[in-house]
Amino acid sequence: MPDVEFRYLLLGCLAIALLVAAFTDIRRRQIDNWLNAAIAATAPLFWWASGLALWPDVAWQLGVAAITFAALAVLFAIRAMGGGDVKLLTALALWIQPVWFMRLLVVMALIGGVLTLVLGAWHVARRQRSKLAIPYGVAISAAGLWVLASQYLPAIQSPAAQAGIG
């Protein structure tokens, strides 16, 4: 049986964890393993509080997380993405329904593109010769927070989403 209050408590904790991930990525260009592990480890509590069935709901979550990790591990191997970013997105895949996770990826790519352009321009304007490091955890966290707000805060959902259409 779903436990709405506990689910919202967990979502609040996830939101705080995403803010911490963004902050540490800006500050140190690193997302701590303990934070990613905590996000992943609390996903089963969220499944329980949401009333997800093991089959097919939890199976879908695990499948999307496995595919996410496999795809992003390739990006990590070619040094296109940091390890913390890979683990953060994989952990988020355990929390977010597959349809919403696809939306997260689109929003993340858009935010990441803007972030790259802004930081790239700043890098050029300051005439820095060092390699530009993009704190992609910011884009991941912002997209994750957008999904949480869009999916779980009825006050800001569209009428179609409230009716179960969106």
Which stretches of residues belong to each language-model region?
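A membrane-topology feature that recognizes alpha-helical transmembrane segments
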Residues: 1-166
